[in-house]
């Protein structure tokens, strides 16, 4: 399940589809805006004001008709997301703000669902694989962090989230297949 279809989630979803991951879930509530184009490679100028999750579902299904692409056009919330998350083996945290990331962290802990966190800001990116109750969780890394430090306020160089999103897809493929050691496993 890819949660967030922006700069991280767009390339992550594309690579999961290209790899033939049987079922790719997509969750986002946003629409395409002109400010997205420098880093969100699934969308085009003609897509402005259209649902990101529906556009991504259409594109990924055309790209690889052998996979199932499930779309959840909704905002992340503990009430609605847990039932969706439990349907998947791994979640990719492709969100763009700490508050939502920490909410996803808690839902994944509650459902015991492994997740691959990715983040990018300015010229920097990070990624880690979190297996609930086998090591630290995302809140352990950011117990006193400020919610003021997010992409909307700080900006991000377009290729940075692309690189991190591709790494998240690679980690998800390794996790699902059991091949190799996860990079940055917490």
Which stretches of residues belong to each language-model region?
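Adenine nucleotide-associated cytosolic modules
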Residues: 1-185
């Amino acid at each position: 399940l890819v949660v967030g279809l922006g700069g991280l989630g767009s390339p992550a979803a594309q690579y999961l589809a290209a790899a033939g991951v049987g079922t790719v879930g997509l969750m986002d509530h946003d629409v395409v805006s002109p400010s997205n184009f420098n880093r969100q490679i699934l969308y085009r100028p003609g897509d402005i004001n259209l649902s990101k999750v529906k556009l991504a579902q259409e594109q990924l299904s055309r790209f690889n008709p052998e996979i199932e692409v499930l779309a959840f056009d909704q905002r992340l919330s503990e009430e609605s997301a847990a039932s969706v998350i439990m349907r998947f083996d791994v979640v990719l945290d492709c969100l763009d703000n700490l508050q939502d990331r920490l909410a996803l962290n808690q839902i994944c802990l509650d459902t015991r669902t492994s997740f691959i966190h990715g983040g990018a800001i300015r010229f920097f990116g990070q990624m880690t694989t979190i297996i609930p109750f086998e090591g630290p969780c995302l809140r352990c890394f950011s117990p006193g962090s400020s919610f003021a430090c997010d992409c909307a306020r700080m900006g991000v160089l377009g290729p940075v989230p692309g690189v991190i999103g591709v790494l998240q897809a690679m980690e998800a493929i390794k996790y699902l297949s059991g091949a190799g050691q996860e990079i940055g496993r917490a």
